[in-house]
């Protein structure tokens, strides 16, 4: 960091929040073919090289503090306590797949522990919390404190966070800046609340809550008028007027699953406390870790981490 910046009392460090679990998994799916046995060495090399690439990108743009955000479903996600069907389709798809999910997850969990012990990054990893939770809570915190923030993720769910000042999002998958589809962060968010988000098993307010998990062949989701989405996005009180009673009840369910402003206060507090109390390993540990872990090729580029 520039010495002049450090001496400037008004200087606020740029912070990069990396959607670690999404980036690591998407990279692994591209690099490891079906039926190939995945081991710790393979996953370690892939993750460290991915981190190096994204950290270099962030620091080049002036975001010098790096925060890795982890999905931790060891005891199941907290949203599944509220809605049993949440992301249940993913487990079903994994069971039918010939990709080595067990080898990948076992290895990635070990690498996450290594990152906590040896690498100079804050690793946000709390049982039952998703990377989305960490990113949403910390974006709000850092933005209100005056920091500029870079989210590194290809996930379109984060466009609702673009409403905060000084927030940008880079998609490493598409190698471009993520823009709000509708031009409004509020409309993007409300579209998913009302129409649902199939990839997470969240259904439209016009059908039963577990529609995507229990759907039978031939069932369709009724359409939702864009004018209704926009009206409720601009004034949420309109939801009571424009939706039927059953749709309004479903709307309230979807708020908890999709709108980051509805992350429970106790979860947000736990995230902030975890961040504030995190003890960073010294940079001096990187070299010994690389040598011990068989990453000697990376020792020449330690400054890029």
Swiss-Prot record:
Its EC number is 3.1.26.4. Keywords: DNA replication, Endonuclease, Exonuclease, Hydrolase, Nuclease. Plays essential roles in DNA replication by removing the RNA primers from lagging strand fragments. Exhibits 5'to 3' exonuclease activity on either RNA/DNA or DNA/DNA duplexes and endonuclease activity on either flap or fork DNA structures. PANTHER family: 5'-3' EXONUCLEASE FAMILY PROTEIN (PTHR42646:SF2), FLAP ENDONUCLEASE XNI (PTHR42646). Gene3D superfamilies: 5' to 3' exonuclease, C-terminal subdomain, 5'-nuclease. The keyword Hydrolase applies. The keyword Protease does not apply. One of its GO terms (molecular function) is RNA-DNA hybrid ribonuclease activity. This is Ribonuclease H. GO terms for biological process: DNA replication, Okazaki fragment processing; DNA replication, removal of RNA primer. InterPro entries: 5-3_exonucl_a-hlix_arch_N, 5-3_exonuclease, 5-3_exonuclease_C_sf, FEN, HhH2, PIN-like_dom_sf, T4_RNaseH_C. It catalyses: Endonucleolytic cleavage to 5'-phosphomonoester.
């Amino acid at each position: 960091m520039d010495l002049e910046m450090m001496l400037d009392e008004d200087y606020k460090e740029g912070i990069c929040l990396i959607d670690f679990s999404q980036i690591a998994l998407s990279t692994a799916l591209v690099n490891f073919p079906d039926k190939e046995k995945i081991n710790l060495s393979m996953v370690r090399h892939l993750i460290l090289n991915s981190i190096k690439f994204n950290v270099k990108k962030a620091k080049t743009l002036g975001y010098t503090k790096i925060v890795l955000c982890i999905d931790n479903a060891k005891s199941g996600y907290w949203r599944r306590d509220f809605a049993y069907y949440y992301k249940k389709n993913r487990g079903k798809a994994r069971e039918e797949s010939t990709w080595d999910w067990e080898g990948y997850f076992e290895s990635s969990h070990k690498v996450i522990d290594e990152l906590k012990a040896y690498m100079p990054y804050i690793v946000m990893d709390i049982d039952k919390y998703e990377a989305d939770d960490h990113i949403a809570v910390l974006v709000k915190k850092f933005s209100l404190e005056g920091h500029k923030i870079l989210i590194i993720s290809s996930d379109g769910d984060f466009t609702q966070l673009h409403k905060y000042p000084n927030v940008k999002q880079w998609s490493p998958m598409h190698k471009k800046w993520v823009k709000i589809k509708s031009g409004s962060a509020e409309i993007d968010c409300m579209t998913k609340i009302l129409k649902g988000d199939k990839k997470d098993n969240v259904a439209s307010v016009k059908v039963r809550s577990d529609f995507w998990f229990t759907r039978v062949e031939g069932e369709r989701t009724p359409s939702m008028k864009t004018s209704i989405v926009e009206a409720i996005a601009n004034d949420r009180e309109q939801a009571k007027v424009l939706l039927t009673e059953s749709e309004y009840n479903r709307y309230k369910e979807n708020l908890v699953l999709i709108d980051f402003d509805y992350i429970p206060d106790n979860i947000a507090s736990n995230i902030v406390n975890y961040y504030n109390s995190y003890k960073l390993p010294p940079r001096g540990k990187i070299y010994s870790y690389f040598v011990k872990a068989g990453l000697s090729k990376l020792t020449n580029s330690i400054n890029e981490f």
